[in-house]
Amino acid sequence: MHLALGKGLRRAAERAGEIGARTVQVFVDNPAAWKRRIAPPKGLDAFRERLVELDVRPVAVHASYLVNLAGPDRDFRERSIDVLASDMAAAAGYGATLVNVHTGSHRGTSVSEGIERVARAVAAVLGRQEGGASGYRDVTVGPARASTPTLVLENAAGGGASIGTAIQEHARIAEVAAALGVPDGRLAFCLDVAHAWGAGVGMDNPDEIDAWLAEFDRELGLRRLALIHLNDSRAERGSRTDRHEHIGAGRIGERGVRHLLTHPELRDLPFVMETPGMDEGYDLVNLDRARALIAGETLAPLPPEAFEVKPRSISQALAEDDIDERVAIVAPP
């Protein structure tokens, strides 16, 4: 479950326990801003320790939405590398082992050029992590938090000249990154189910899901599929748009979602839901719907008001009470 942090880190950790989440994803900063914190938020140690007590693992971080590793603008790409490197370094303080990012758009140049840029950016970001920095100035990560997270590239729905719509594009990124010295274990991939649907993959059909997984295994190896974003979709298949919906209530529906949740090749992978209304109690509603599908149950229809809730929040990176007023928020150096 993607945890909203708008009510504070401590409250978010307790919410994970209340709903029985087994894995969580968070933002370490505002995903819609370039500026990054220079010190960890208050409550971070308590947040991390509570998740350990609850045996919530893995913890994943979703990087800034502003990142575009594929674009031709050198300055913008360098800023993207700075922000992604900052988010990766800060992730260690949250106990995160995965940092998920959108690869971005080639902005009308070419897919091959975009792939080359992404691979080089990946190598640059991972090269900065070898020193074990915390991501915050003058703050050192202790031994228990010094492991470097895996960078995870998410598939795209296909709009706006995006890179990563096809499995072959991710495979080529991995190939170029390897040639630049990036070890296989440092770079992995995420399947966002709603994105795949938007890109034209029949995620409502078990046979098409199996075909997608077989192709991924041929091109990259299923060992490199590290994370699944389990989202239904309100968009049309192949629309190249990304519109998340409640579990089993969208166009993908119960059959496809159940097949993913019970697939033997996926049973050990973390599933994260980024569904609507997380701040309004629908985090538990959607988690319970996923559990019901695993149990083979038919889902009850959702009430009309369920479809009027806010989409998943992207701005609530940290609550005000987690921010030390003495600490300025600045752009990465």
Language model region names:
Residues 1-63, 67, 71-86, 137, ...:
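N-terminal pre-domain/capping segments
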Residues 2-6, 29-31, 64-66, 104-106, ...:
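Active-site beta-loop-alpha junctions enriched in small/polar residues
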Residues 9, 44, 80, 84, ...:
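Aromatic/hydrophobic pocket-lining residues that form the small-molecule binding cavity
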Residues 16, 62, 80, 91, ...:
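Conserved, mostly hydrophobic/aromatic
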Residues 20-22, 53-59, 94-97, 131, ...:
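Short, well-ordered coil/turn segments that N-cap beta-strands
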Residues 41-61, 118-130, 173-179, 252-263:
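Alpha-helix-loop-beta-strand connector modules within alpha/beta enzyme cores
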Residues 69-188:
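Active-site acidic/histidine proton-transfer and metal-coordination neighborhood
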Residues 135-139, 171-333:
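Histidine-acidic metal/acid-base catalytic patches
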